[in-house]
Amino acid sequence: IDPYTRSVSDVYQDLFGQGSFIGKGIYDVDAFERSTGARFPDNRILSHDLIESGFARSGLLSEVQLYEGYPARYSADVKRRQRWIRGDWQLLPWLLPRAPVRGGGRERNPLSALSRWKLLDNLRRSLVPPALLAVLIMGWFVFSHPLAWTLGVLALIFGLPLADFAVGLTGKSPGVSSLRHLRAQLHSLGLQLLRDALTLAWLPFEAWYCLDAILRTLWRE
């Protein structure tokens, strides 16, 4: 579950009453300081949104829409995502029973099981490109039935937009003609399939920079 780009209806907020801080919001400075305090080692965490919301907690207002800039070039987006991945893996110690604190040492980790799951899910997402590339390579050169492995990876990449398209067809707004609704859904599907095609084309590079960020972080830690 990607907490950063699927904020219209948030599963964590809907089911557990606890959202994920996504970098924009209103917060009580004093309450935030009391909650986080000396929890984190200085200058050791690049990605702090989820870990801070785990301690301070956050609620999500799904009806509020915010806008922010997005990198104009793929290279800039890669640098940003690589920094995020490094930050996510810096949070690996907070999955353990005892976590680091400011000034050195460790203390009992007070994060809830839900907060730890969010951290783990972020780590899982950074492993998706390397895993998909590994499946393709193993399917082509090691396992039998390479076509089946290839189709499986393609289904994972292109299956979600097709499922979203099927669901979107049932959500026509009142006053919108069926033809206009269908055209809008087809346009959205086409754009998403193009983005996913680029994801497939860039898969080797995406796998490389994910592994590079992960291994650099683990080595330095």
Predicted regions and their residues:
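Non-transmembrane catalytic domains and loops of membrane-associated enzymes and transporters
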Residues: 1-200, 206, 213, 217-221
